Amino acid sequence: QPDDKISDLSKDVNLLTTFLAHREVDLESLKRGNPVDCILICASSVLNQASQLFHAMESRPPLARTLVLVGGIGHSTSLIYDAVARHPEYSTIHAKITGLPEAQVLREILNRFYSLPGVEAGGPRVLVEDQSTNCGANAVKTRNVLDEAGITRIRTCIVIQDPTMSLRTKASFEKAFEDLPQLQRPRFMACPIVVPVVHAVNGQLEYVLDSAADLRAEDLWEMKRFGELLVGEVTRLKDDENGYGPKGKGFIGHVDVPM
């Protein structure tokens, strides 16, 4: 039955999304838990993640001692400009952010629409890494930014990234700090704020939307693009000659990808 096939497909997509998102901590437990040393947010066209994080930090500034906004200009930066243009609030700064590195777009959003207290008033130190052009460089250059700021003893570090790339990004950060003695390495935890769920509706895949998180279908990927991202990501994670692991390009450590 075609409907059964779509229903099976939705289960497969959700399984894959859950694996790639690799959520180890969610925003609610982050809000309630002890402050962490560092939160890294990698810019993504899913702006809802930044919105929810900035809102949480506005209501509880000591959430993290350091906040790093991450992302230069890469192959999908234009999608972030498009997402800003479509956004009901942020669209007012579209002209100003067009052409900026991704991390600077996040900084504009943070400064214009949210108010965090300064470090002296208990707020986080905000750093910007705006030179990287891919996931591996995000990690290496973020470490440089932290080192230059004198932030070298990080115990707990939350990584917020596009849910389709969350597992790989965490692996990239672990790789970037692997030269440190085991006890001095940060403990990285993946915290994708938005993890899409799909279901079958009239023979089509559609997103299950979370009204509490203020998430709209247009905030997410077109479904075909979403599928392509998921499949491409699995290829990168596999530790073989085509992947990004030790047996391939060596950008990340070994990741077990279930068959």
Model-derived features with residue positions:
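A structural signal for short, hydrophobic/glycine-enriched beta-strand patches
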Residues: 1-211
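A conserved mid-domain beta-alpha-beta active-site/ligand-binding segment of alpha/beta enzyme cores
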Residues: 197-259
